[in-house]
Structure formats: structure tokens, C-alpha cells
């Protein structure tokens, strides 16, 4: 965590020369070299098109909170033109999409009500006085993607006589050694160093799983394959994938996506472990794999039962027949299983599904009896509302343990706080200085994320559009070398990533 006020402006001048803060050996293209077509109107935007890319010329709307579109009329927005949002007094919050590379001179000049700006990690150049006169803007996070930012871009306004004044205590969040960092130095602003961001994403859940695999493995003998439209088998399979040093990839029921096929080819894998029965991954899909990968029946293994409870048991039995620890999670909630999957993998502990109340599934009950005397400690993830005390007393008894002593509950007030409590209780499992973020209300982009965080030995943070008090408190106590994000900006928006960075700065 770094917060510094430099001793003198002249010291800063010695560090960087010229009117713009530019990274060494980085040259930003000049948008003045583009000859655009005549302006066209789409909704509140006037825009021009050059070489298939959109330049926003003027915004005519009155929105207070605005996310600038990444595309207009099917063409990507690449440039926010000079003075495009000038004097937009209604604007209080704006998000600039990752499609944008250039924020031109005076783009948001004198947006006097603007308090919050999210600059996505596609932006490379920020022009002169782009945010001049935004007196209510007290801080900004300049991402590491920005290679050129003019000295007078942020933190200045003029009085009635035209005298330039500085916004009091203006603060820049930036990565060390970046253009934003040098901009803070040259302007003698306070600054705080944030971790770099690594976003691992594809165009869909299958491509994201393949991208996570590629990030983790240069090659692999084995691949674990799970159904991509459900979470139960995939998340129960994270400890197995970690044990086998295998990526976890996803498929449809009857057709294996090209992204998955291509990743298996890249890995050179010759063994595929299928999670779940033919109701989720059919023989038709297996035959496709055989044909396209030139494999035979001997290259496949299926771990399955008639339900998610039974499949989780089959996976557990194969992964570790003699577990000393075990995790219970609610069968109908992906969040808790996702939160604990990497921890379970690191501890070589199976993930077993339970209902909220009632009787324990017969297959699960038989499994618990089979590991009775082996399991010394078990953990139930989530509060009494997801797995009741009554159910836990039954599960503990089946293991020959006592709920409240050798079987303990790890829970917060909601899925986000439960995830935080997991990270605190099992902090010893995390040796990495990294942290990963996944969407809390949906599972697709993060299904394979558990294997990544297990291999990298990093905690998982579940969040959506904001951070609650428990998450902010957790982040403030820690520094991270990298923040990894699972999925695109539609799953985990840049505004949320920035909140994580700022909370831990």
C-alpha cells in the first residue's frame, strides 16, 4: 500500500520530460491523423466512422449515470472525440468501455457534476484537459493500459477570471511505473499503487474455461470434462482436477464446442475424465471426441451416478478414498461450492452435497459411513438457511463426529460474506500474493476458475456490482501482486475491478 506526496514539482520534472506522461518506448497514435466520415446520429450520440471504427463526436443526452456503449450500430467505439461530452452538467458517473483506445482533448471538459470515472483497460491515450473543470472529481484510477496521459488531464479547473486552480487533495490510483504514475508525480498529486489486473476471458463459458486452462498449463496428460450448463459436477470435480494436474474444460450435452476440442489438442491430452452421466454429457459427445481427437474407449473414464449427490460421491471416492477432512455444501447453490472449491482442492478434501433439511441422500449416507473414522474434521459452508443444524447433526453422526466441535460451520450473512469467511478461516491454504474475482450471482465464467485458483494457491472473491463491508475490510488488510478476473466485463465489470483495487490500495 502506497500513499505519497512528492516533495517538489521540479523533482518530478527531472523524472519525466514533455507535456505528457508517456511510458518509455511507447508511442500513442494521434487521432488527428484520422479523416472521419460525416457525423451520424444514433440516439443521444453523434458519431463518425473510419475504417469500421466509431468516433463519438458529441453526446446530446442528459443522463446522470452513463455507460458509454462499446459499439454503435454494430461498429466498435474506438475514440471519444474532442469536446464530445463538454459541459455535460448532468453527468455524475461515467464508464468508458474497453473498446475505447483514445479519450481526446477536452472530451469531458467542464463536466462539473462528475464524481466518478471508470476508465477501462482498453484505453491507451488520454488527451489534454480531457477532464479539466471536473471540480467534483476527487480521484481517478488510471489503468496500466494507458501509455500516454497529458499533464493537465486531471485535477484542474479555472475560476471566473480564468485562473487555473488545482482540485484539493486530488488522488490518483495507478500501477507503479505507468503513465498514470508519472502523471501523479509530475502534478505533485497524492497517489496510491494498485495491483495489475489479469482478465482471463473468452467469448463464452467454453472459451473462458479454455483460456483458464491455457493460463495454467502448457500441456497435460489428462483433462477433466464437465457439463457447461450446470455447476454441480464441475465444482465437485475441482479437487479431482487439481490432484490429476488436469484442466477442467466444459462441453454441451451432445456437441463438444470447438474451443474445448482445440484446447485438448493444444494440451496433447490423451485421457479424458467425464463428470456426470449421459443425461449431461451424452455418448454422442464422447463419439465426437473420439473422432476428432483420434481416441478410443480406453482414453475415457466416466464418474457418474443418477444425481448430483451421487456423482459428487463418485468423484470424492476416486479423488481421495481416505480423506481426513471434508466439505459439505448446499446442493442447489453454486456460490458456496465455488467459494470453497480451491480450498478443498488444496486440502485434498472432497466436496459433498446436502439439502437444506430432511434426510441425507442414500448414496451420500453410504459414503459418509464408508469414511467414518477417517474424516477427523468436516466443514459446512453457508448458514442455517442453506444447510440446517438438523441436517448437520445427521451428517456429523454419520461420520461419528460432533456438530459444533469436529464439524464446524463457515458462514457469513450472504454468499459474498461467506466467501470472505472461507478466505479468512483457510488463509493458510493460500501461498500466492494474488487474488481472483468471479461473478457471485451466476456461475458460467467461473466454473473452471476453481482449478486456476487451486493451482495458483490464491483466494477467490465473489462479487457483483459492489463490495460489502466484510469484503472491504478483508481487502484493506492485504496487498496483492495481481488481481485475476474470470470472465469478461459483462460478468465482472471494470467498475467492480476498480473497487477491489482501491479497497486494497
Question: Model-found features: residue ranges?
Answer:
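Sec-dependent N-terminal signal peptides of Gram-positive bacterial secreted proteins and lipoproteins
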Residues: 2-27
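Sec-dependent signal peptide cleavage junction
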Residues: 19-41
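Structural signature of tandem-repeat unit edges
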Residues: 21-24, 44-52, 61-79, 89-102, ...
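Conserved functional micro-motifs across diverse proteins
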Residues: 55-56
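Consensus positions within tandem repeat domains that build extended binding/scaffold surfaces
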Residues: 82-84, 104-107, 127-132, 152-153
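Long, low-complexity, intrinsically disordered polar/charged segments
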Residues: 132, 140-175, 213-224, 320-325, ...
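Short loop/helix-cap segments at secondary-structure boundaries that form the rim of catalytic
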Residues: 181-186, 287-288
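Extracellular glycan-binding segments that recognize GlcNAc-based cell-wall polysaccharides
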Residues: 193-505
Amino acid at each position: 500500500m502506497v500513499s505519497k506526496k512528492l516533495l517538489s514539482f521540479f523533482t518530478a520534472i527531472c523524472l519525466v520530460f514533455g507535456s505528457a506522461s508517456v511510458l518509455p518506448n511507447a508511442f500513442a497514435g494521434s487521432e488527428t491523423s484520422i479523416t472521419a466520415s460525416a457525423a451520424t446520429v444514433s440516439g443521444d450520440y453523434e458519431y463518425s466512422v473510419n475504417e469500421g471504427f466509431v468516433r463519438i463526436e458529441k453526446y446530446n443526452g442528459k443522463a446522470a449515470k452513463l455507460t458509454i456503449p462499446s459499439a454503435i450500430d454494430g461498429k466498435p467505439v474506438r475514440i471519444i472525440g474532442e469536446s464530445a461530452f463538454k459541459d455535460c452538467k448532468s453527468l455524475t458517473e461515467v464508464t468508458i468501455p474497453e473498446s475505447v483506445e483514445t479519450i481526446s482533448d477536452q472530451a469531458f471538459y467542464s463536466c462539473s457534476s462528475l464524481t466518478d470515472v471508470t476508465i477501462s483497460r482498453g484505453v491507451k491515450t488520454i488527451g489534454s484537459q480531457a477532464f479539466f473543470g471536473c471540480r467534483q472529481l476527487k480521484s481517478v484510477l488510471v489503468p496500466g493500459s494507458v501509455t500516454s496521459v497529458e499533464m493537465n488531464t486531471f485535477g484542474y479547473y479555472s475560476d471566473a477570471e480564468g485562473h487555473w486552480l488545482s482540485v484539493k487533495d486530488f488522488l490518483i490510483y495507478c500501477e507503479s511505473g505507468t503513465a498514470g504514475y508519472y502523471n501523479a508525480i509530475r502534478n505533485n498529486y497524492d497517489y496510491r499503487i494498485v495491483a495489475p489486473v489479469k482478465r482471463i476471458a473468452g467469448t463464452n463459458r467454453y472459451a473462458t474455461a479454455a483460456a483458464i486452462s491455457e493460463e495454467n498449463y502448457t500441456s497435460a496428460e489428462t483433462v477433466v470434462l464437465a457439463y457447461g450448463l450446470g455447476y454441480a459436477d464441475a465444482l465437485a470435480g475441482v479437487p479431482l482436477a487439481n490432484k490429476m494436474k488436469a484442466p477442467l474444460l466444459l462441453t454441451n450435452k451432445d456437441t463438444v464446442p470447438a474451443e474445448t476440442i482445440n484446447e485438448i489438442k493444444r494440451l496433447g491430452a490423451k485421457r479424458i475424465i467425464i463428470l456426470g452421466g449421459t443425461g449431461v454429457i451424452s455418448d454422442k459427445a464422447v463419439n465426437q471426441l473420439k473422432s476428432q481427437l483420434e481416441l478410443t474407449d480406453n482414453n475415457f473414464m466416466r464418474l457418474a451416478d443418477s444425481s448430483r449427490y451421487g456423482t459428487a460421491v463418485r468423484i470424492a471416492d476416486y479423488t481421495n478414498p481416505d480423506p481426513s477432512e471434508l466439505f459439505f455444501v448446499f446442493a442447489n447453490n453454486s456460490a458456496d461450492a465455488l467459494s470453497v472449491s480451491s480450498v478443498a482442492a488444496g486440502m485434498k478434501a472432497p466436496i459433498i452435497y446436502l439439502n437444506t433439511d430432511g434426510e441425507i441422500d442414500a448414496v451420500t449416507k453410504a459414503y459418509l459411513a464408508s469414511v467414518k473414522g477417517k474424516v477427523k474434521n468436516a466443514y459446512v459452508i453457508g448458514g442455517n438457511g442453506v444447510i440446517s443444524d438438523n441436517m448437520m447433526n445427521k451428517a456429523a453422526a454419520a461420520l461419528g463426529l460432533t456438530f459444533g466441535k469436529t464439524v464446524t460451520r463457515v458462514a457469513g450473512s450472504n454468499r459474498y460474506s461467506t466467501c470472505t469467511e472461507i478466505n479468512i478461516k483457510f488463509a493458510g491454504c493460500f501461498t500466492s500474493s494474488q487474488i481472483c474475482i468471479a461473478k457471485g450471482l451466476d456461475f458460467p465464467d467461473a466454473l473452471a476458475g476453481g482449478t486456476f485458483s487451486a493451482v495458483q494457491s490464491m483466494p477467490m472473491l465473489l462479487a457483483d456490482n459492489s463490495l460489502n463491508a466484510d469484503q472491504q475490510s478483508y481487502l484493506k488488510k492485504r496487498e496483492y501482486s495481481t488481481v485475476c478476473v474470470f470472465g469478461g466485463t459483462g460478468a465482472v465489470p471494470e467498475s467492480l475491478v476498480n473497487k477491489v483495487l482501491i479497497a486494497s490500495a
